[in-house]
Amino acid sequence: MDKVLSFHQGRLPLLISMPHAGLRLSDAVRDGLVEEARSLPDTDWHIPQLYDFARDLGASVVAAEYSRFVIDLNRPDDDKPLYAGATTGLYPATLFEGEPLFKEGLAPSGEERKRYLEQIWRPYHGTLRRELDRLREQFGYALLWDAHSIRSHIPHLFDGKLPDFNLGTFNGASCDPVLAERLQGVCAEATGYSHVLNGRFKGGHITRHYGDPAKHIHAVQLELAQSTYMEETEPFTYREDLAQPTQVVLKQLLQALLAWGAERYQR
C-alpha cells in the first residue's frame, strides 16, 4: 500500500503523533461501509491543519494517511481492549454512535486485515519508535504528544458534553507528574475552555506503550473537543474563527512541554 503516513523530522526533542487524521480507504473497506460511515464521521478532522504551527516550533510530526476505519493505529496489534465499556478495536466494527460500520457480510477479510496490520500499522509504529529513539539519543530524552479530537457529544461513549481539553497520561504512568501539573496549569489559565486530566480519555495504546518516564520518554495524549475548532456535523468544516484561539492554547501547551523538558534535563 502506498503513502501510508507522512513524516517530518524536526529539530527539538518533541514528536507529535496524529494516528487518526487519515482519510484514505482501502477498496475493501470503501466497498463495505454503510451509508452513514461514508463521510468518515469518526475522523480526527483537520488535526494537521490545526497543528500547522508545530513544524515552525521545531517538532517532528508523523500523521496517518489511512482512516481509522481501515485500522486503528492507537490500538495494540493484539487488539486487547484499552477501556472498559463501549470502545472500538484495532479493526473497528461499529461507529462511535454504536451502529455497524459495515454492511452485512462485507467487512474486510482476515487476510485483508493482516495486510493492513503489516503495511499500515507496523510502518507507523516503526516510525514512532525510531524517531523517539533518535530524539532520546540526541537530547537525552524525548517528548511525545499524541494529538486527537472527537465530537463533544457522543452518548454511546460518554455522558453529557466532553470537556474541551482532555489530557491523558494513563493515570500518571506515561509522563512525569510535574509535567502533567504544568499542562493542567496551562489549561486552567485558558479563558473560556474547560479541561480534565485522565477523565474519559486517559491515553490510548500510543501513550501507554511509548510513554516510559524511567527511560526518559514522556508521553501525553490530548483529546480535543471538535467544537473548539470546527463544525461537528457534515461537512465537518474547519472554523478559523474558532481554531485561532484554540491554536494559541495548543501552542502554549507544547511550549510548556518543551520548557519542562529543558528544565528537567537541563538542556
UniProtKB/Swiss-Prot annotation:
BP GO terms, sorted: L-histidine catabolic process to glutamate and formamide; L-histidine catabolic process to glutamate and formate
Induction behaviour: Induced by either urocanate or N-formyl-L-glutamate.
Activity response to pH changes: Optimum pH is 7.5. Retains over 65% of its maximum activity between pH 6.6 and 8.5.
Keyword Hydrolase appears in the UniProt entry: yes
Regulation of activity: Stimulated by Co(2+). Fe(2+) is also a good activator, particularly at lower concentrations, but it inhibits slightly the activity when used at concentrations over 0.1 mM. Other divalent metals tested (Cd(2+), Ca(2+), Mn(2+), Zn(2+), Ni(2+) and Mg(2+)) are not effective activators.
Broadest EC class assigned to this enzyme: hydrolase
Keywords recorded for this protein, A-Z: Histidine metabolism, Hydrolase
Similarity comment text for this entry: Belongs to the N-formylglutamate deformylase family.
Entry function: Catalyzes the hydrolysis of N-formyl-L-glutamate to formate and L-glutamate.
Description of how the protein assembles with itself and partners: Monomer.
NCBIfam families noted in UniProt: hutG_amidohyd
Name under which the protein is recorded: N-formylglutamate deformylase
Organism: Pseudomonas putida
Chain's gene name: hutG
